[in-house]
Amino acid sequence: MFGRLGNDAAHPEMQLSPLGEAVQQAWKQIPERQAEHGNRVAVHACVCMPDHFHGVIEVLEPMEWSLGDIMQGMKTACTQRWWQMNGVPASINRPNSVDCNNANLPKWLREKAAIYRSDGELIRHLSKKQRQEYYTLVGREQRPLFDDNYDDTVCLDSRHREAMIAYVHDNPRRAILRRALPDVMQRCLHVRIGGHSYGAFGNLFLLRWANKVQVQCHRKHPASGQPYEETADYARQREQWEKAILGGATVMVTPGISRGELLMKNECLEKGYPLIHIQKDSIGPYWKPERQRFDACANGSLLVLAPWELDSMEAVNGVPSDSDYSRFHNLNNLATEICSFNGEAKIFKQ
């Protein structure tokens, strides 16, 4: 729709269609159009993917409009351009009596058609489910280009903004890798492993490896009270982990929470060692890992798992389950279960 991916992962590019160029142009025009309404915003990066769009927008000063209002304005402009390209007449002033005053139509539609005079007004006051039914019943051509709503992330600081911009620019490369390597770039919203459910992203085949070794470290050494990663015991453990990895057919399993766990997790990512990382953040339909873990997934060396309802698991030693203390122990208990798991993970299609 917006174009197609060209080249390879080493030299990714998006070859835009006329519609993709129109969407990109609408994005670049946001600051100028919003200035007409007294809103000061800036756009920093954008990319049209074949079937969706990414962009970074900055609000320069407080304004009466919400970000949703601005996004809706851009989406409406794109929809109108799409209609023009396809020779579809605008629907904004079409009277509802043309196709709504029909006794065979649902009662809710006839009631709303009596309230809102134009098609545009009517559409704005329908729920997503009602709109979908309306398009089917009435057979309208004037469907919106974009889905309802949008997925957003709030930028925290300048470093976060630069990471956002880098992510936007990296999208074509990521998409090429996902298409080229579907087996090791899977996103599954429901995977059952042993007695627990997870969201997953990456190489699910790592669960089949016979030798799964847990990396678990407390923050302090139980005898000396030293930071555990600074002790001789940790050095010996790490040497054993590395020996197991280099011996072959071994995958590390860890949440990477304590400093000692984090150091080993990062070494696996940097050196391409097989790793199952159990994280506390959930994996939804739009979730993707940051670049380092994404590339590890592309190399087939990483599986990211996110347990369902982590904060509803058992409290540990009377400490609430949504505390860092209980999360640390519960995630490591899950790592123990995964290491002993030798069955087949059950994947539920969603």
Question: Across the structure, where does each feature detected by a protein language model lie?
Answer:
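Glycine-biased, small-residue-rich flexible motifs in mid-sequence functional cores and linkers
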Residues: Q186-Q350
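Short catalytic/metal-binding and nucleic-acid-binding patches
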Residues: M1-C188
